[in-house]
Amino acid sequence: VRLYIASSDDILQGRVTDIYFVRTKEILIKKGLADVRVRMEFHVNGVPRGYEWVVYSGLEDALKVLSQRPVNVYSLPEGTLIPSNYPIPLMVIEGRYVDFVELETAVLGILRHSTSVTTKAARIKRLGMDRKFIFFGLRAAHPVLAPMLDRAAYIGGFDGVSGIMSEEYLGVKPSGTMPHALIVVFGDNVEAWKAFDEVIPEDVPRIALVDTFEDERMEAIKAAKALGKKLFGVRLDTPSSRRGNFREIIMEVRWTLDLLGYKHVKIVASGGINEKSVQQLRDIVDIFGVGTSVAFPQPVDIGGDIVEVNKGGEWVPISKRGKLPGAKKVYRCSTLEYEVVPWNSTPSKCFEDVLELYLQEGRLVKKLPSPQELREYVLSQLKNLPEPTPTD
């Protein structure tokens, strides 16, 4: 019995790779091409239908992988929004190809998965900028991915994450409520709510799950009476098989709580929350718990291609068909307006150079922002954009 996971050493040493990269390295070395230097660019190749922008993330992980090799790495800042219909280089790796060839698999996997999760989180957050969102998606993926998923969702704009390792990795105190299992074990919802209040530290918000045994409205009233002013919120997580009209159920709960003097109690909704349900419920829900739709989003496709080879000390543009040869620099005018020019050219309209040097011969030369700073960076850009049209 074992866990089928790769260790950090496996990843950093290039053992998590595709066999054709290993064979490529062997061929280049044996044929005297080990010293050939290249510039490889990473671009967004495709996005889910309806996506007008993506949020680039996963850079810190990718830099960790590449820092094991003597390469230069240029990149957009992590958390940067880019338009989905314009081929903007996200990252450029410069160095001997044999020094990083087997790392392409890991770098692409990191960037694609993290960018996909962060983009979905940002789309959902943009649909409810004045609402709170907590990431509940760890149970939707292999546990080895938990820190990455929490980080990607958080920097995408989510206000909290449920994973307990988030405090260690992100400096974010984990957020959560209570499971149905707690109430089922007690066999009585009021006893379970009171036990939570008696045992759990006071700084943890009292959010009662109110759809275990009875009608949601009745359980919400019981919770409010049992905990009074200490009750921060009620969570509705009704299974879709029994939900009926979720909006009407929530409105009924809200109306009744207000009528009985419990206007301070927040409404928390979870269970199958996606872009469309956020748009439909954001006027009556204070906090959303979002899981699978963020943990397993439609993918943002990112690819890597050699665009220049150094011959005799000169960089020579070259690429496979369908790709633009030659390394490029990236300049930004505004949130989604960019200008891409050949490496040594001058831009004509955009003058903020956003493709910056992060690794020099494998050594980090630029300070990386904290998760909190990345999140604020993403939110500052989202404020400049119209709401996305929900796609799920």
Predicted regions located by residue number:
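Ordered alpha/beta subdomains of enzyme catalytic regions
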Residues: 1-204, 230, 303-392
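Glycine-rich phosphate/ribose-binding loops and adjacent secondary-structure elements
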Residues: 177, 181-338
